[in-house]
């Protein structure tokens, strides 16, 4: 099981502060629920924990290993982290891969679909 530690995490998107000095710890074998209004940074926080976005300020540790500096060992650890959104929309006429690619087609994304599929495998 994993332990997750967030220390002094701050994150901006387009110069807008999304997360400001967030601190918390999840002990091994724990379950957490992140609640908040739309735009409060829930998805941003989850993307940072999953390594889908780069940490700008602060630290995210999984089993005492820094997420941003542990590219080689964390993929197996990150596979043990899951998150479920309250609302989701899948297009039934698309494959799983096409559903994953859909939002990337409309954004200037730095991510490649193959990288995302590797993370979710």
What are the roles of these predicted feature ranges?
Residues 94-113:
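ABC-type ATPase nucleotide-binding domains, specifically the catalytic core motifs of the NBD
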